[in-house]
Amino acid sequence: GGINLNGITEKVDAIIPVHIYGNPCNFDSVKSFAEEQKIPIIEDACQAHGAIYKNKKVGSLSEVGCFSFYPTKNMTVGGDGGMTTTDNEETAQKIKSIRDNGRKTKNEFDRLGFTMRLNTVNAAIGRVQLRHLDGKNSRRREIVSIYRKNLSDDCILPENKDGKSVYHQIVLKHEKRDEIRKELTNNDIGSAIYYEKLIHQQPVYEEYGYKLPNSEKFSREVLSLPSYPLLT
């Protein structure tokens, strides 16, 4: 897939590149295009805690980065949660306001907002999890090296040559994906498909009739293999 240049209009508020499966995207090309079009970037690093692109941690490559702490992620908070990072003070204040119902001061609300405050117990769990993040990510990299050594045809999705993936998912791509998954199931080996139904195929968007053949082909051929740090 790629960015449709003809689809860029004044209605576009931001470009959101995704570091999918924990693998950094080709951020320089996104940044170059965004700067040319004067469009801000919001990084989706929800699957990429600790991933690196050109010696910088993802989530810090643009003004705003977003992380998820959902229980299946490389780092969690003992429940659902998330984090937004920014190096811009004005943006930081807006985010703090929006997460607290649009609050400006104790008794003033100057924008619409939401209740998205992370409680202190979840935050404390997250701080402990953070200490172990690098070690767990290293274990994921050990696991993928074993897969690569034992699987043929380079079927594991490649790592960005300018980055360091944290392998939130270890994903193979193969035309016979469904046959492979059936064989794994028959041998009591778990697997998963992300994402079987793409955004433009969801009922909420299907009326627009988008056709994205590259994304659709990719979706038909990818399969996530077991990849958690305690895998033996």
Feature names for model-found ranges:
Residues 1-77, 83-85:
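Active-site phosphate-binding strand-loop segment of PLP-dependent enzymes
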Residues 2-7, 14-18, 23, 27-29, ...:
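PLP-dependent aminotransferase class I/II
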Residues 79-80, 127:
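Amphipathic alpha-helical segments within well-ordered protein domains
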